[in-house]
Amino acid sequence: MSEKHPGPLVVEGKLTDAERMKLESNYLRGTIAEDLNDGLTGGFKGDNFLLIRFHGMYQQDDRDIRAERAEQKLEPRHAMLLRCRLPGGVITTKQWQAIDKFAGENTIYGSIRLTNRQTFQFHGILKKNVKPVHQMLHSVGLDALATANDMNRNVLCTSNPYESQLHAEAYEWAKKISEHLLPRTRAYAEIWLDQEKVATTDEEPILGQTYLPRKFKTTVVIPPQNDIDLHANDMNFVAIAENGKLVGFNLLVGGGLSIEHGNKKTYARTASEFGYLPLEHTLAVAEAVVTTQRDWGNRTDRKNAKTKYTLERVGVETFKAEVERRAGIKFEPIRPYEFTGRGDRIGWVKGIDDNWHLTLFIENGRILDYPGRPLKTGLLEIAKIHKGDFRITANQNLIIAGVPESEKAKIEKIAKESGLMNAVTPQRENSMACVSFPTCPLAMAEAERFLPSFIDNIDNLMAKHGVSDEHIVMRVTGCPNGCGRAMLAEVGLVGKAPGRYNLHLGGNRIGTRIPRMYKENITEPEILASLDELIGRWAKEREVGEGFGDFTVRAGIIRPVLDPARDLWD
């Protein structure tokens, strides 16, 4: 990354209204408790609409019926999305049975949605069920604290089912980092769990009274897998192992994918390497990165508030030196590491502990009973007999982890009968979409509902050109906020308007290069026509082992993005 002339450490100016809201919220309480009892509306009013995000919820409505309800002079059908805090995606079978029951009985859509933040979401929770969902989660040792808004969100960890010891150590650090960076306010416990108000003053020693300037995302990564897409995240701890044992981390800071259509001051950015640290400094360094961003992040413009913009404004070296000062350490030089892929290994994998792990492909992460494919019931039946745990992956799939040889056949039988092990193409396995319509208020174009038939068409093109055994990392996101991580794909579609997308090309398979816009505001037939030609060229002209994204760059079809803060929009 090139360095800008360092700008001011703190941006002066009028603070955004979100900063006022946080300051006046009494450490995230607002009037949420009173609002819960207001039966006149299905939603939350005023500041509470945004404050509930700190408690892991977003207020949404069903956009498929919004116009119809407006004609009937009815308010939108408000319902909440709830996102669980689940560091590293590990969930017990007892917890799974509880969330299965809640989804079936107390949500509009009846589904469990696995997300690429390695957790699950409920969609369609009516206001009367909001408090019960938090209490249900608490009863099985879960919560939804800090999974949205201006905090450190769910901490991701590579779902490595093979190196069980290394995964266990990395997962423990993901949990420790998550716990260390949680808010200290008692608001969550008071409002949702009916815990008594204590006559002490709340303090937030790490996050501060107005929390972070913007969302903040953290990962723990075990090379050579980049399944968690580290370059989409603010703070990344890359595991360095010696003889299969974790000894420390390389730290990379300042990744992020969200942009705004037409706003050239916004850009996706890959994370910058800061250096290596031994394990004992992990929490101090995590805290130092977060507090530096807390103090230096831009609170006058939320579109310029993420860590990636702070790094570009003050300079990577300045930010790094401040982290060293606050943590009381000096980073060592980056230790060697490399990535070879980021997809999940679907099917059975035997771990070095001799247990088996079954990775199930779940298209779009949507767990529901479909005609002839009762995925939700199948997973519930497995949860009832499985002695190990489940692991949600950052590719929206599910691992049945720690299966002894003696239980393999029984679990495989249920999985096959439920459609959980249906054969799919390599292309489908390596494609992903965010939720988008009908529930996401920011959606500009379809994503989850568009992807299955779109991949049917891509599969046909792959077959036509004789590359059906290959794959292209392909992602669809319904708007430029980028939850579908299209801005790290080889082929990324970013929603622009209903039925229209910007087509980005030139990312790579391992997720270390941002793709550039190739065509703007085009329809599915136009996208397929472009890809038909390009996949045909790739099939004929590629070098041995050359991925589609690397080919588009080498062949001069698209210029690579080398320094996105300066050349993404060129």
Curated annotation (Swiss-Prot):
Range of residues in the leader sequence: none
Keyword tags: 4Fe-4S, Amino-acid biosynthesis, Cysteine biosynthesis, Heme, Iron, Iron-sulfur, Metal-binding, NADP, Oxidoreductase
GO cellular component: sulfite reductase complex (NADPH)
Cofactor(s) required, per the database record: siroheme; [4Fe-4S] cluster
EC number, UniProt record: 1.8.1.2
Co-factor binding comment: Binds 1 siroheme per subunit.
Cross-referenced PROSITE patterns: NIR_SIR (PS00365)
Residues the record lists as binding siroheme: 483
Top EC category: oxidoreductase
Subunit structure: Alpha(8)-beta(8). The alpha component is a flavoprotein, the beta component is a hemoprotein.
Biological role: Component of the sulfite reductase complex that catalyzes the 6-electron reduction of sulfite to sulfide. This is one of several activities required for the biosynthesis of L-cysteine from sulfate.
PANTHER family for the chain: SULFITE REDUCTASE [NADPH] SUBUNIT BETA, SULFITE REDUCTASE [NADPH] SUBUNIT BETA-RELATED
HAMAP family assigned to the protein according to its UniProt record, in alphabetical order: CysI
Name of the protein in question: Sulfite reductase [NADPH] hemoprotein beta-component
Gene: cysI
